[in-house]
Amino acid sequence: MTLIHPTAVIDPKAELDSSVKVGAYTVIGPNVQIGANTEIGPHAVINGHTSIGENNRIFQFASLGEIPQDKKYRDEPTKLIIGNGNTIREFTTFNLGTVTGIGETRIGDDNWIMAYCHLAHDCVVGNHTIFANNASLAGHVTIGDYVVLGGYTLVFQFCRIGDYAMTAFAAGVHKDVPPYFMASGYRAEPAGLNSEGMRRNGFTAEQISAVKDVYKTLYHRGIPFEEAKADILRHAETQAELAVFRDFFAQSARGIIR
């Protein structure tokens, strides 16, 4: 059985595993690498120095590896790197990185990216995330593991969203969202704990309670942020589920939602 449709346009220099399926009218550029058992639907365009792993499913009209929407970009050989087992739905756009950023845009494994989502230059997306339709990341955004972005979520440049966090429909994320927390609103504010997401991913009642105490410390005790952070970091020394806050606070450039 022919795995590549005869109307697909694939540069001879592109490197595709023999098991890759390519649909009608798809275009694949010379610097693209695609791993085993990845399936690409019709009318997709994959360009740039793009590496795609194994067992991905890319739907029709996806645009992957085009140049970043950055006026400073001067055709440098930056990259897009996509891991394994991802579902990338219709009309998604993933851009290359920039030399003023980390030089690459990275997507991990087992992510579910729904239609019309956009990942700008130098974004880093972890594993097992869900992006609902039309979620968009500006440049230099970092998304942790098991994050859920509601439809039409917009994330500002350089923001971070921590592991197991969740945003509501049309959230405008202008500051960092800590791990396990929910955020909602045009200028996103704290909206409680993603306790259901934690339960679904095997956290115990005791672990959820410990994270709930962190939420209360940050938002309900009425103490200054630096004092709240110090208290959380003390508890993180003995509670493994809180250790993620140590790195998150240390790497936060925009501050957290309040």
Swiss-Prot record:
Designated name of the protein: Acyl-[acyl-carrier-protein]--UDP-N-acetylglucosamine O-acyltransferase
Pathway(s) the chain acts in: Glycolipid biosynthesis; lipid IV(A) biosynthesis; lipid IV(A) from (3R)-3-hydroxytetradecanoyl-[acyl-carrier-protein] and UDP-N-acetyl-alpha-D-glucosamine: step 1/6
Example GO BP: lipid A biosynthetic process
Catalytic activity, as annotated: a (3R)-hydroxyacyl-[ACP] + UDP-N-acetyl-alpha-D-glucosamine = a UDP-3-O-[(3R)-3-hydroxyacyl]-N-acetyl-alpha-D-glucosamine + holo-[ACP]
Listed GO CC annotations: cytoplasm; membrane
Subcellular location field: Cytoplasm
Alphabetic keyword roster: Acyltransferase, Cytoplasm, Lipid A biosynthesis, Lipid biosynthesis, Lipid metabolism, Repeat, Transferase
CDD domains: LbH_UDP-GlcNAc_AT
